[in-house]
Design a protein with these regions (language model features):
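Gly/Gly-Pro- and Ser/Thr-rich, intrinsically disordered tail segments characteristic of DNA damage-repair
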Residues: 1-234, 280, 355, 364-379, ...
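A broadly conserved detector of short glycine/acidic/proline-rich loop/turn motifs that flank catalytic sites
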Residues: 41, 255, 298-300, 347-349, ...
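Short Gly/Ser/Thr- and Asp/Glu-enriched loop/turn motifs at secondary-structure junctions
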Residues: 107-111, 149-152, 246, 287-291, ...
């Protein structure tokens, strides 16, 4: 039987949820005008955490300072973020999705997957998806997109098609027509640097990736990432829905600063310490991870977070730190004061696939030896003097 997976994604979640609250209080619908959410609208150094569609058309993006947003749009309506209310909206939205299928995986505060394979009762999948979308809108007052596909990848890709308040399908036999013409950077797990590297080799679309021989792709992005990328570009994804009762354990470490940090080098040193600690805990439990998440809290208590899947299981501090740095660069403009940072690891395995990678990157043996020395010191005392990685190495702390 063909799998049927829904991916449900709230449209401009924080902005939509703030709009619903204002409407219940008799206010205007800020979704219809240039508007944004910020931790502290009165502080021009505060960061934009969400923007309405009219605001996005004016160039208002998340993670830019309020001062910059106001220069782009002097009449921008800015509202204060309300995390307690957001959690309430998230729970309500998930509860409705769970009524359609108990096999649910919450992917973030504003999106989830549900397995509808045995829940359609001979109904059309897109028809059921529209019913779910409309029920959320009617009962909760905000809109979602629902992507429908035969696996998680296709469902998520489909939900990112035209927004808002839409249902889109992306079945395996629709991949060439609907997915292949999209830019390579739209493919799940393809970030900015990978996109730029692909572009340098004349690979511009998802179809270009799909048609490229896997061994040729491996020479560009590395053997392990190439296999996953090639499968994804062809719509192949066998990952199951992981319910909250099945989820693997995660490890995270946060660090709150006595004084807000604005200096990039100082922040990098603190991230280095966090990465060392969280990677040490991972190794101590005998696991490797395939997912890294990065969390930052600004001085106005607004929060930004990202997660990424890495090309192969690892417990190496340098590789984990590299991913955290990359995600930080996507969330922080380098000037907004930061109060707290955190790094999380999840999707654990005991695979030792890095043994093959040692022959591809000689530095890995150096990083492993560094980690061994760190773990040895840590076993003797919690007070570890942080060693510096070799200069020019990917794991090198910047100060």
């Amino acid at each position: 039987m063909k799998r049927v997976i829904f991916h449900i994604d709230v449209n401009s979640a924080f902005l939509s949820w703030s709009a619903v609250k204002l409407l219940t209080e008799g206010g205007p619908d800020i979704r219809l005008v240039p508007s944004a959410v910020s931790g502290d609208p009165s502080d021009r150094r505060s960061i934009i955490t969400a923007a309405s569609i009219p605001a996005k058309k004016l160039g208002i993006k998340t993670a830019i300072p309020v001062s910059m947003a106001l220069r782009k749009c002097p009449n921008l309506v800015i509202v204060h973020s309300d995390w307690e209310w957001y959690r309430h909206c998230s729970t309500s939205f998930i509860d409705i999705c769970r009524l359609y299928s108990p096999v649910l995986q919450q992917f973030s505060i504003d999106e989830c997957f549900i397995d509808m394979t045995f829940r359609l009762y001979r109904k059309d999948a897109a028809e059921v998806a529209r019913a779910l979308k409309d029920e959320i809108k009617e009962k909760l007052g905000f809109t979602v997109n629902v992507g429908v596909g035969s696996n998680k990848l296709l469902a998520k890709m489909a939900s990112d098609f035209e927004k808002p308040d839409k249902v889109h399908t992306l079945w395996q036999d629709e991949v060439q027509e609907k997915m292949w013409p999209l830019p390579a950077g739209d493919l799940l797990w393809v970030g900015k640097k990978t996109r730029e590297r692909l572009s340098a080799y004349g690979i511009y679309t998802i179809g270009d990736i799909a048609r490229l021989p896997e061994n040729s792709l491996a020479r560009i992005v590395g053997k392990k990432f190439a296999a996953q990328m090639h499968d994804n570009a062809n719509g192949i994804d066998n990952e199951p829905i992981i319910t909250e009762f099945q989820e693997a354990k995660s490890i995270s470490v946060e660090r709150t600063f006595a004084k807000d940090i604005v200096n990039p080098e100082e922040l990098d040193r603190e991230m280095f310490k966090v990465a060392c600690t969280v990677a040490h805990r991972l190794r101590r439990q005998g696991f490797r991870c395939t997912c890294v998440s990065m969390f930052i809290k600004f001085t106005d208590f607004s929060v930004a977070q990202k997660q990424c899947q890495i090309s192969g299981p690892t417990d190496v501090t340098a590789l984990i730190l590299n991913e955290a740095r990359r995600m930080l660069g996507e969330m922080w403009d380098g000037t907004a004061p930061i109060r707290q940072v955190g790094i999380g690891l999840s999707k654990f395995t005991k695979e030792e696939t890095e043994q093959l990678m040692l022959f591809e990157d000689p530095k890995l043996s150096f990083y492993r030896e560094w980690d061994r020395k760190y773990d040895e010191q840590k076993s003797r005392s919690e007070d570890v003097k942080f060693l510096a990685y070799e200069r020019k190495s990917p794991g090198e702390p910047q100060g």
